[in-house]
Curated annotation (Swiss-Prot):
Domain of life per record: Eukaryota
Pfam families (alphabetical): RRP36 (PF06102)
Biased composition (Acidic residues): 16-25, 143-153
Disulfide linkage: none
Gene name of the record: RRP36
Top-level taxonomy: Eukaryota, Fungi, Dikarya, Ascomycota, Pezizomycotina
Entry protein name: rRNA biogenesis protein RRP36
Region (Disordered): 1-179, 249-275, 304-333
Keyword Nucleus in annotation: yes
Keywords per UniProt: Coiled coil, Nucleus, Ribonucleoprotein, Ribosome biogenesis, rRNA processing
Native source species: Pyrenophora tritici-repentis (strain Pt-1C-BFP)
Function according to Swiss-Prot or TrEMBL: Component of the 90S pre-ribosome involved in the maturation of rRNAs. Required for early cleavages of the pre-RNAs in the 40S ribosomal subunit maturation pathway.
Length: 333
């Protein structure tokens, strides 16, 4: 008789839920202790021989069980194993590469921030090479957004694109924090003498006649200024007083020219009114004609020496103007 009529050994197929792989596991439910039995003659059969026979018998059973498994099931199990191994490898590689790329990008961003801070402290603009390096480091869209936010936060407000570009000023205006709950009319100070409410505005020559005493006051002021210039010994003060005297004299001349033009227009209006009464059409003088008549009147009222001085001064002024408009080649020749 064999060591055991029945060895409690079975083949059990177990399917893993993680990868869908079919495999078979051999489980031994018998006790590990060896059993010694005697044959019909009373001879003791060795346990080693029995174990070898049992193992051969088990191998035969396993082969018979495996022969019943279809090739399709084996192919599916092999594909599942290979796909799982490839996914695991990709995950490991992806984790390593993503971590290394993130570390490199973070180091580059930190370096760029340091360069920006140094350049802003020195008051210089970033160079074109730095801008090119920035564009190279922008690999993904997320990195672009982060770098734009960093540049906006680090950049100075209203910074120029280059030193030759015009200064940029924002068109936005800050809203005032003060709020007028009750609107009050702003007080307006007015002079009734020059306001239309008190009547029509008088003509200029009428105003000048009313305030004619100002002419005498200005003339006396100019005379006093000339005396002070003669008495002062300090050169700096003398130069300032001379400038003041020159401006006052030029203002007086401008007033005289204006009065002369007003006189010309007044006389012309009187003549035209008389002609209109006779039935003729009115004729209005141009500005240029008014200036010509005023200039003729001015030269007629001058003395001979004064007239020569004015003509010589005017000639020099005209020649200087012509020389200024002349080309450089003719001017130096």
């Amino acid at each position: 008789m064999v060591l055991a009529n029945k060895l409690d050994r079975n083949l059990r197929a177990a399917e893993e839920s993680s990868d869908g792989e079919d495999y078979y596991e051999v489980t031994d439910r018998s006790s590990s202790a060896s059993v010694i039995e005697a044959d019909e003659g009373g001879n003791v059969i060795s346990s080693d021989d029995d174990m070898s026979d049992a193992s051969d018998h088990d191998d035969d059973k396993i082969k018979a069980q495996m022969s019943k498994v279809s090739f399709g099931a084996l192919a599916k199990a092999q594909d599942a194993l290979s796909s799982k191994q490839s996914v695991d490898r990709k995950r490991k590689r992806g984790d390593d590469t993503s971590k290394s790329q993130e570390d490199k990008l973070e180091a580059l961003r930190e370096r760029l921030r340091q360069i920006k801070a140094e350049k802003l402290a020195n008051g210089t603009q970033p160079s074109k090479k730095a801008k090119k390096s920035k564009t190279k480091t922008k690999t993904t869209q997320d990195d672009n957004v982060e770098e734009k936010e960093d540049s906006d936060s680090d950049a100075a407000p209203h910074a120029r694109s280059s030193k030759h570009a015009p200064a940029v000023q924002s068109s936005k205006r800050m809203v005032s924090r003060k709020r007028n709950v009750v609107e009050v009319k702003k007080p307006v100070f007015r002079d009734p003498r020059f306001d239309n409410v008190s009547g029509p505005r008088p003509e200029d020559y009428v105003v000048e006649k009313r305030y004619s005493f100002l002419k005498d006051y200005r003339a006396s002021e100019i005379a006093e200024l000339r005396n002070t210039i003669k008495k002062t010994k300090n050169e700096g003060e003398k130069e300032q007083l001379k400038k003041k005297l020159l401006s006052m004299e030029s203002q007086q001349k401008a007033r005289e020219n204006k009065e002369r033009l007003q006189d010309v227009t007044r006389e012309h209006k009187k003549k035209e009114k008389e002609l209109v009464k006779e039935g003729k059409k009115p004729f209005f003088l141009k500005k240029s004609e008014q200036k010509k008549i005023a200039l003729v009147d001015r030269f007629q009222n001058m003395k001979a020496k004064q007239r020569d001085k004015v003509i010589e001064r005017r000639r020099k002024k005209v020649t200087a103007k012509e020389r200024k408009n002349m080309p450089d080649e003719r001017r130096t020749a």
